[in-house]
Amino acid sequence: MTRNILLTVTLICIVFITVGGQSPATAPIHSPSTSPHKPKPTSPAISPAAPTPESTEAPAKTPVEAPVEAPPSPTPASTPQISPPAPSPEADTPSAPEIAPSADVPAPALTKHKKKTKKHKTAPAPGPASELLSPPAPPGEAPGPGPSDAFSPAADDQSGAQRISVVIQMVGAAAIAWSLLVLAF
């Protein structure tokens, strides 16, 4: 039973060693860039000959033919000059349509039978408290520049103290793991 416990604790220590092996401060920030791919040539080229088995005679090289030049294209014929477009005829601008006079609509006549409606007493909605309408008060003592601003989170720590502490922790965990393995067996 004790061997199982010691083995479990040892495995846990080994896991801590491997997980803590690289601290986030030393981890790479950018992923490695891939090498650029060579673009495939788009011009028609003579494909290389298939590899031939080794022979004692040197293969004869065929002369490479130069590409045939295309015949010069004929000069385009001069285009006829186009006359400017004819001015558009001036059209009479239509006048605005006349507005029809509105007819007076008589009010509906009152009837003897009146519908009974329920009257509700409407209470005004409560408004927000006056304290909520004003902006918050500034703190009594605003923090001024002090020693806490000396180390900003953007500045990298170049002292190496963190690396040393991580290495010490890894060595300690490895020593504990090995001692537990020795005690277990």
Swiss-Prot record:
Gene Ontology CC annotations of this record: plasma membrane; side of membrane
Region (Disordered): 25-160
Tissues in which the UniProt entry reports expression: Predominantly expressed in open flowers. Also expressed in leaves and stems, and at a lower level in roots.
Similarity field: Belongs to the lysine-rich AGP family.
Official protein name in the record: Lysine-rich arabinogalactan protein 17
Transmembrane segments: none
Propeptide residue intervals: 160-185
Keywords: Cell membrane, Glycoprotein, GPI-anchor, Lipoprotein, Membrane, Proteoglycan, Signal
Localisation: Cell membrane
Main location: membrane
Role: Proteoglycan that seems to be implicated in diverse developmental roles such as differentiation, cell-cell recognition, embryogenesis and programmed cell death.
Compositionally biased spans, kind Pro residues: 69-88, 135-146
Gene (name only): AGP17
